[in-house]
């Protein structure tokens, strides 16, 4: 593959813009390449696609395409992405949908900007397009936001309000189509202080790498692993597991599942405060755990 296409936007919530200096160079590259979307599941904004590329995707039926939508309000999308063409790029969604291209969508929800009524509008528009899946995750804010657009984090009340919208719309889709389609990131449940849904809720975990159902998926895997393991009283040791603050309570509960069958194994879960990015960044608390599990 030739040189990767970089992002032409300057989104108000961009995580890369919130990184400190001095990290490895590859972390600062903003990819926005449709080829990587198909090959590796990267999300693209559609703002740098040429008509030739659109035609090629449709002709070759390159599917699925993962799209960072954020909002279907053209004016608001331009504002959120600091790109005057961002609203016009939404028309590509309809072109892909008409061509039978499967669309997986992502929405980074920002309090008071693209949630509430705007989120309902986006859901309604995406439902009409027949998208395959839409993941909604809360904006992540680091302590390195000097000079950037003023954003606020979700608190328990606002997270619960947004979660209600997502779950209600998803419930309606289950009734109409037999599939949920619209999912909330695990962080919404954590911030709203609500229980993580059971694995069946996630219908095969279509967006687990986006933080959708990651906790439920890990718990299910542990349950299966324990069930398939034979009891061995010779297993007698202590383990210390370090993780982020957000996931620590859930991991402690999961370790009890192991202790039930292997009482001689003592697992101590230690929560580590994220001083590097700041306390507002919680996704890495369990996303990195999951990533290292597959290394």
Which positions does each model-derived feature cover?
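Short helix/loop capping segments that flank catalytic or ligand/cofactor-binding pockets
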Residues: 22-24, 145, 191-193, 250-252
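Redox- and metal-dependent alpha/beta enzyme cores, enriched for Fe-S-associated oxidoreductases
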Residues: 236-286
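Secondary-structure transition/capping motifs at alpha-helix termini
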Residues: 96-101, 127-132, 173-176, 261-265
């Amino acid at each position: 593959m030739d040189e990767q296409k970089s992002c032409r936007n300057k989104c108000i919530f961009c995580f890369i813009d919130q990184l400190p200096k001095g990290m490895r160079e590859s972390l600062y590259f903003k990819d926005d390449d449709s080829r990587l979307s198909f090959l590796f599941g990267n999300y693209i904004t559609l703002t740098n696609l040429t008509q030739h590329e659109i035609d090629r995707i449709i002709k070759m039926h390159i599917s699925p395409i993962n799209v960072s939508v954020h909002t279907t309000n053209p004016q608001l999308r331009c504002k959120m992405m600091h790109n005057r063409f961002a609203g016009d790029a939404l028309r590509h969604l309809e072109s892909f949908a008409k061509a039978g291209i499967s669309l997986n969508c992502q929405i980074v929800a920002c309090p008071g900007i693209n949630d509430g009524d705007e989120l309902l509008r986006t859901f309604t528009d995406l439902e009409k397009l027949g998208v395959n899946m839409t993941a909604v995750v809360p904006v992540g804010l680091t302590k390195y936001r000097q000079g950037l657009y003023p954003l606020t984090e979700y608190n328990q009340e606002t997270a619960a309000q947004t979660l209600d919208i997502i779950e209600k719309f998803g419930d309606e889709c289950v009734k109409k189509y037999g599939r949920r389609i619209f999912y909330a990131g695990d962080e919404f449940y954590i911030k709203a202080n609500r229980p993580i849904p059971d694995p069946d809720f996630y219908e095969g975990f279509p967006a687990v790498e986006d933080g959708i159902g990651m906790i439920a998926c890990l718990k299910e895997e542990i349950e299966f692993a324990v069930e398939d393991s034979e009891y061995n009283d010779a297993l007698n040791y202590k383990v210390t597991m370090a993780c982020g603050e957000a996931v620590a309570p859930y991991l402690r509960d999961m370790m009890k599942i192991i202790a039930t069958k292997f009482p001689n194994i003592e697992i101590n879960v230690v929560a580590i405060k994220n001083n590097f990015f700041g306390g507002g960044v919680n996704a890495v608390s369990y996303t990195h755990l999951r990533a290292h599990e597959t290394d």
